[in-house]
């Protein structure tokens, strides 16, 4: 097996037993693929597929004017280039987007000609606003902040059948309903009422009998009955009737007279119920007709109108119940044939017939009018209006679209074979739905499960953007239609017709403020990846929190391998926001698919198929862990399988598919929890969620016990620098890596240099620090997609969210009561959990009515000391240490004349003093913050003079760019001259560059010449001369290219910034704040074991083992049994073994043992104890030494979920590390020196520091701001608010009779305005008395009573 650059340096011991059939797919594919599909950026006109933007344009265009004399057609579109790259957009606070230019064609027809001859054609490109681009990591930069569009899980379009679970009617009768849900357009519902009539609702309005809809579609009563019922035919024979017999229809009826066969043998006696046995006998006897008395048809319903044979008079309409009166008429008129509907109470109810009876309409027009009245109550209906409204509802492609998915689901559900068809409904569709609904009511067929993932589909970014875009285009269409009529007469161009504002606004609104466009969770790489893989049932067109019941939130059998059953938030959103499973993807219709291996005749193949929830239902699917022999055959007599959404066992021959991996059930976050299979589900949920809140520590530390997914997450998250192409590292420093690309990967005519600029100390969305550190050294060889630099929370290309801590499970002095955590001071000293947080503070200078604000160091009434960290422009120096209240940017604002006191006016009059015209509005460091200034950015409006600071920042940025380009040129030049050297050496020169004719060119000769002189050489061979000329042209060309590139970037830097109206200048100051761990911070393991640091003890007081090694963390053992997350104990044991092995290797390295010994010991670790074998023989001795060096801190282990280390393997590892197999040790109390009475579990657990830091939460108020109306103090830390003294707290003081405390709580400390100002003055004067007055809330109450029209006054004595 081939190891990558970083894998070679540190191999993770893998305990997995099952083979890797399929790698985990690229984790951000769901976002990137969807948006790529939407934009189709590289496609030419002919390559456009009918999706995304192209589909949106095609659905709205061509736009035809009202008169039909002009049309605007869509030809194609192209995307421009972004003005700034991603980093610049974040810095400048702008959107990373490209201009969209659409080519449209205006066609004007000749009014006079009969066949609409074309009079004029104009084509033009029209600008249609900006389309945000997705960055390569699946995010969008909108107004300078990174956002993620979360995918939405919504109900698939199509038809669904359901019942009300007996909740509507008191009898508990099941009322069935059908609903046709389009992708866009009106919903159509059919439902039964308790009397078994069928009703229809359009868009959940008032219900009408379903037959009204059928009549509106043009069906007559007879046609409706014909479609839904079969008929019984009776021939009239004098006083009796002869029934054309279909024996099956008699089942369950009571014979009204003896039924005999031809020979007179009685088959059924009179009064007996006819059973299946009787029917068989009747069929055998071959009886075709049955004589019945005339009253046999009483109460039956006519299927066709009964007509007088002579006069043509209608004796009974169709769908009429036959009674004695009608029968008498029939007998009198000598009618020969009667047709009645065949219905029974078992499987053929009279529902449609009954519905027709309650229907008041009798023809199509009346039905249309009835529907018009229901949709538009109060408007007078006309025939045209009624027809238009009805046609627009379901039959017009502009108003109604089932979409390809909807049509496919619709046809499948009603039992058709073809899956493609029109996007609008037709008559047959509606009848088919009604038939299916009636069948279900008759007991044939079952209702749908709406929580089945075959009935819910995922809407990704691309699709939602397309919908928004279409909304914008439809708005444009209305305006264009009106202007098109002018275009005919006035000769306008397409540009003049189209106003792109509505499109731009719709797109901007979607990306900026849609519920699904979320501020990216950027705590650490895992939280980024999880956020992009999130699937939400909320959002526009989805559910709302309040209305979502238990069923929607619950885990469904179809979630298996598609949606993670573990990772979902706790709280009101539980089950509504889910995470994609590790291997899941969406298919072309948007349904989630999971991969499976194909199994043929109990033989497992390596062929992989992706199936959606519907497709997999009929398969018999074995678990990934099913036992196989060497040939890949299933060997167990019975295999545990999933079939029809149930878990069961089957014989191996019946198995058709098998899971690809045990971790395909869970999401990325859950698959990072080692020994997940030993944790309770609730705790696993917390563990998954808390990993996303881990703050990146100062020095990342890989987990000793991982799952092997760490590398995938780090690689796919995009926080690491990954080699785009293989090559050799040319130079590397802290901020950039330069790679000379390998010759076989260089494309012709390009430089063959890859420069990677690393991100240094940048702020993330959550104010944590993003910093990249190079892993490679000069001269190293790297392959494509090797990791060259670590990002935040990554260590050698593996995700590293926390730190490995030596922990002991023991109760100790009550310091770990109720999940508290006791830490050793060493953890603080070694900066194990020190994190860096970066805050961005912004100062904006605006143009006010009284004049412009000014950024300056000349601030009134501020001492020298406060200004010593500012430069002459009034902006703080980079590197300055600042604390709360320090000035970062000096700014003064013009002050209005009105605020002058008489004394000031006098002074102004005497001295003509102008200094007090301005007030100090400087940017200061907020309370409770202290840190170091690490960066300053100045943005200046066009036309405003730039200050010295802005110019110096610009100069340093230009130097950086110049350095990059020079580096690139240097390598290009070097490579070119190397190639020339190898071509020229050993050949003869003709002269030039001071050489004699026929002189042989050697390395010495070339070294003696300057590079410029090489091109003056004339060689004997023409081919070499040509090569020299080409090389010279190439180098000149590259130089020019790079100079152009530099000029372009320089222009961008020097142009003014596009600031909001009224803003002259923006200064952004970035502060780096260092936070050590302290009591009150929240920490957690990966198993949902969270707690708050209660105390930090000196190292010497901590419990230590026989060697004197103190533990770092003491955890409470009582936190384990009741919570059932035993995974943490196993992790602790295996962590101890990992550390022990590392120490053993460390001793071997320090004793400078032979490489062969190291090799043997490493082989013992990796290849002798369970799990996957590693190919150590392919390593050179130097690589073995490098590996051993990196393992000295501990041998990292991987125990994948559901396929991890067994207890016996953990014991074997402990034994190999010369540690007790119990994992327990005798500890000594550091305070007393006494041994503890029993052995204690000690080991290494991976601990995370969560982003719930006490510094951000601790808060106290002295005086501060007050609410305007009630005059009470505000609440919350952000407003510098106070603590609420609520109703119950007042009761407490009342109960204790603490009258004075209560009085000041309700008056001077709250809303007695005069009392509190007076008290403040008194305290300043050293007088501690108070005089409570009238609370402001009393005045508010009086005003509220007056607002109700009641005059109320307070009578004062």
From Swiss-Prot:
Keyword list, A-Z: DNA-directed RNA polymerase, Nucleotidyltransferase, Transcription, Transferase
GO cellular component, one term: DNA-directed RNA polymerase complex
GO biological process: DNA-templated transcription
Protein's job: DNA-dependent RNA polymerase catalyzes the transcription of DNA into RNA using the four ribonucleoside triphosphates as substrates.
Record HAMAP family: RNApol_bact_RpoB (MF_01321)
Family under the similarity heading: Belongs to the RNA polymerase beta chain family.
Protein name: DNA-directed RNA polymerase subunit beta
């Amino acid at each position: 097996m081939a190891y990558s650059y970083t894998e070679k340096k540190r191999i993770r011991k893998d305990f997995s037993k099952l083979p890797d059939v399929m790698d985990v797919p690229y984790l951000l594919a769901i976002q990137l693929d969807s948006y790529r599909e939407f934009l189709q950026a590289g496609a030419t006109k002919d390559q456009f597929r009918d999706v995304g933007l192209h589909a949106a344009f095609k659905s709205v265009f061509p736009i035809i004017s009202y008169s039909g004399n002009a049309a605007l057609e869509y030809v194609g579109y192209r995307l421009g280039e972004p003005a700034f790259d991603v980093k610049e957009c974040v810095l400048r606070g702008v959107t990373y987007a490209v201009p969209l230019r659409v080519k449209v064609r205006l066609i004007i027809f000749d009014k006079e000609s009969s066949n609409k001859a074309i009079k004029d054609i104009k084509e033009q490109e029209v600008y249609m606003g900006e389309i945000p681009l997705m960055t390569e990591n699946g995010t969008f930069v909108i107004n300078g902040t990174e956002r993620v569009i979360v995918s939405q899980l919504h109900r698939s379009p199509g038809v669904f059948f359901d019942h009300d679970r007996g909740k509507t009617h008191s009898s508990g009768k099941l009322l069935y309903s059908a609903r046709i849900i389009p992708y866009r357009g009106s919903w159509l519902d059919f439902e039964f009422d308790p009397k078994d009539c069928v009703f229809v609702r359009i868009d959940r309005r008032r219900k009408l009998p379903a037959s009204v809809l059928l009549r509106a579609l043009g069906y007559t009563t007879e046609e409706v009955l014909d479609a839904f019922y079969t008929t019984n035919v009776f021939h009239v024979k004098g006083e009796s009737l002869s029934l054309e017999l279909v024996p099956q229809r008699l089942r369950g009826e009571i014979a009204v007279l003896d039924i005999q066969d031809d020979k007179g043998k009685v088959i059924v006696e009179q009064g007996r119920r006819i059973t299946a046995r009787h029917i068989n006998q009747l069929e055998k006897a071959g009886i075709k007709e049955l004589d019945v008395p005339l009253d046999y048809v009483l109460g039956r319903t006519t299927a066709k109108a009964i007509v007088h044979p002579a006069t043509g008079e209608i004796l009974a309409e169709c769908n009429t119940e036959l009674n004695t009166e009608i029968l008498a008429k029939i007998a009198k008129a000598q009618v020969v044939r009667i047709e009645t509907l065949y219905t029974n109470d078992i499987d053929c109810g009279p529902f449609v017939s009954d519905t027709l009876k309650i229907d008041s309409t009798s023809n199509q027009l009346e039905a249309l009018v009835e529907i018009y009245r229901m949709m538009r109550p109060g408007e007078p209906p006309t025939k045209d209006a009624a027809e238009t409204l009805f046609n627009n509802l379901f039959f017009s492609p502009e108003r109604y679209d089932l979409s390809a998915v909807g049509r496919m689901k619709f046809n499948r559900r009603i039992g058709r074979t073809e899956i493609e068809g029109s996007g609008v409904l037709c008559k047959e569709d509606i009848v088919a739905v009604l038939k299916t609904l009636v069948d279900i009511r008759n007991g044939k067929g079952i209702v749908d499960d709406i929580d089945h993932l075959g009935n819910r589909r995922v809407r990704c970014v691309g699709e939602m953007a397309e919908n928004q875009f279409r909304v914008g285009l439809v708005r444009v269409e209305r305006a264009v239609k009106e202007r098109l009529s002018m275009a005919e007469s006035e000769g306008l161009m397409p540009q003049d017709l189209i106003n792109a504002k509505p499109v731009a606004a719709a797109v901007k609104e979607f990306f900026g403020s849609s519920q699904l466009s979320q501020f990216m969770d950027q705590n650490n790489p895992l939280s980024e990846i999880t956020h992009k893989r999130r699937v939400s049932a909320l959002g526009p067109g989805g559910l709302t929190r309040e209305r979502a019941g238990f069923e929607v939130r619950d885990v469904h059998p179809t979630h298996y391998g598609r949606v993670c059953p573990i990772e979902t938030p706790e709280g009101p959103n539980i089950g509504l926001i889910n995470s994609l499973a590790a291997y899941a993807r969406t298919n072309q219709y948007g349904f989630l698919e999971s991969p499976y291996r194909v199994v043929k005749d109990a033989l497992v193949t390596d062929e992989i198929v992706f199936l959606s929830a519907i497709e997999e239902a009929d398969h018999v699917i074995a678990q990934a862990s099913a036992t196989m022999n060497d040939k890949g055959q299933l060997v167990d007599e019975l295999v545990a399988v999933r079939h029809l959404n149930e878990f069961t066992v089957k014989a191996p021959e019946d198995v058709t598919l098998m899971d690809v991996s045990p971790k395909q059930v869970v999401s990325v976050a859950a698959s990072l929890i080692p020994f997940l299979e030993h944790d309770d589900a609730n705790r696993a949920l917390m563990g998954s969620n808390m990993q996303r809140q881990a703050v990146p520590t100062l020095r990342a530390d890989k987990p000793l016990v991982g799952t092997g997914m760490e590398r995938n997450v780090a690689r796919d998250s995009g926080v690491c620098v990954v080699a785009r192409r293989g090559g050799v590292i040319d130079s590397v420093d802290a901020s950039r890596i330069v790679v000379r690309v390998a010759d076989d990967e260089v494309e012709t005519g390009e430089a063959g240099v890859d420069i990677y600029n690393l991100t240094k100390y940048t702020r993330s969305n959550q104010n944590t620090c993003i910093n990249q550190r190079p892993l490679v050294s000069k001269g190293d060889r790297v392959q494509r997609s090797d990791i060259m630099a670590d990002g935040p929370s990554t260590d050698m290309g593996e995700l590293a969210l926390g730190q490995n801590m030596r922990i002991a499970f023991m109760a100790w002095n009550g310091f770990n009561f109720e999940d508290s955590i006791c830490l050793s001071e060493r953890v603080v000293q070694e900066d194990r959990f020190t994190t860096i947080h970066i805050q961005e503070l912004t100062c904006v200078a605006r143009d006010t009515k009284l004049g412009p604000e000014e950024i300056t160091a000349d601030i009134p009434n501020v001492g020298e000391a406060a200004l010593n960290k500012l430069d002459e422009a009034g902006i703080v120096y980079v590197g300055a240490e600042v604390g709360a209240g320090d000035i970062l940017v000096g700014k003064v604002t013009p002050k209005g004349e009105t605020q002058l006191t008489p004394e000031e006016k006098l002074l102004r009059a005497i001295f003509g003093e102008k200094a007090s015209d301005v007030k100090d509005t400087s940017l200061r460091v907020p309370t409770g913050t202290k840190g170091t200034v690490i960066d300053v950015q100045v943005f200046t409006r066009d036309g405003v003079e730039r200050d010295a600071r802005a110019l110096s920042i610009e100069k340093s940025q230009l130097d950086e760019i110049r350095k990059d380009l020079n580096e690139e040129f240097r390598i290009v030049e070097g490579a070119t001259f190397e190639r020339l050297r190898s071509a020229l050496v050993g050949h003869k020169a003709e002269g030039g560059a001071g050489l004699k004719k026929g002189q042989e060119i050697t390395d010495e000769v070339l070294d003696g010449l300057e590079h410029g002189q090489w091109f003056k050489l004339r060689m004997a061979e023409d081919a070499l001369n040509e090569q020299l000329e080409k090389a010279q042209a190439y180098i000149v060309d590259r130089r020019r290219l790079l100079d152009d590139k530099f000029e372009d970037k320089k222009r961008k830097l020097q142009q003014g910034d596009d600031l909001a109206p009224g803003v002259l200048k923006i200064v952004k100051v970035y502060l780096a704040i260092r936070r050590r761990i302290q009591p009150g911070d929240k920490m957690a393991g990966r198993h949902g074991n969270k707690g708050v640091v209660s105390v930090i003890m000196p190292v010497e007081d901590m419990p230590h083992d026989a060697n004197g090694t103190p533990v770092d963390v003491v955890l409470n053992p009582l936190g384990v049994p009741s919570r059932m997350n035993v995974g943490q104990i196993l992790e602790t044991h295996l962590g101890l073994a990992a550390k022990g092995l590392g120490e053993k290797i460390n001793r071997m390295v320090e004793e400078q043992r032979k490489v062969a010994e190291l090799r043997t010991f490493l082989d013992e670790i990796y290849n002798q104890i369970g799990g996957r074998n590693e190919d150590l023989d392919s390593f050179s001795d130097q690589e073995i030494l490098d590996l051993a060096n990196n393992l000295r801190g501990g041998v990292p282990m991987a125990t994948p979920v559901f396929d991890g280390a067994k207890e016996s393997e953990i014991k074997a590892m402990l034994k190999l590390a010369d540690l007790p197999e119990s994992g327990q040790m005798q500890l000594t109390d550091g305070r007393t020196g006494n041994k503890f009475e029993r052995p204690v579990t000690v080991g290494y657990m991976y601990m995370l520091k969560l982003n719930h830091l006490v510094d951000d939460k601790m808060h106290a108020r002295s005086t501060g701001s007050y609410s305007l109306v009630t005059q009470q103090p505000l609440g919350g830390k952000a407003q510098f608010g106070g603590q609420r003294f609520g109703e119950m707290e007042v009761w407490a003081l009342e109960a204790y009779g603490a009258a004075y405390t209560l009085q000041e709580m309700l008056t001077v400390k709250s809303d007695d305005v005069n009392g509190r100002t007076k008290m403040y003055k008194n305290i300043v004067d050293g007088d501690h008395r108070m005089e409570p007055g009238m609370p402001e809330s009393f005045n508010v109450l009086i005003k509220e009573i007056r607002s109700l029209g009641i005059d109320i006054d307070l009578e004062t004595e």
